[in-house]
Amino acid sequence: MPNIKSAIKRVNTTHTAEERNISQKNEMRTAVKRAHSALESNADNKADLLSFALKKVDKAAQRNLIHDNKAARIKSSLMTAAK
C-alpha cells in the first residue's frame, strides 16, 4: 500500500477507471452477442440491436478499451452476418 498521498489518490483513480473500463467492455461484448444472436434468429429488432452494438464497439475503440483493428473486425463480422 502506498504511503505518499498522491500515490494513494492514484491507486483510487486507477481502481475506479479499471472498474469503469471493465463495465464498458462487458456492455460492448453483451451488445455484440445479442446482435449476433438476433441476426442468426432473424429477430424483429435486429436492426436496432445491430446499430446499438456498432455504437458500443465504436465507443470502446474511441476510449482505447479495444484496438481499432479489433473494432473493425467485430464490425465487419456483424455487417457480414447482417447481409
Curated annotation (Swiss-Prot):
Family, per entry: Belongs to the bacterial ribosomal protein bS20 family.
Stated name of the protein: Small ribosomal subunit protein bS20
The species this protein was found in: Staphylococcus saprophyticus subsp. saprophyticus (strain ATCC 15305 / DSM 20229 / NCIMB 8711 / NCTC 7292 / S-41)
Keyword Calcium among UniProt keywords: no
Keywords, sorted A to Z: Ribonucleoprotein, Ribosomal protein, RNA-binding, rRNA-binding
Single GO MF descriptor: small ribosomal subunit rRNA binding
GO biological process: translation
Compositional bias of kind Basic and acidic residues: 16-25
GO cellular component terms given for this protein: cytosol; small ribosomal subunit
Region (Disordered) location: 1-25
Function: Binds directly to 16S ribosomal RNA.
Statement: the UniProt record of this protein carries the keyword rRNA-binding: yes
Gene designation per UniProt: rpsT
Pfam families in the cross-refs: Ribosomal_S20p
SUPFAM superfamilies xrefs: Ribosomal protein S20
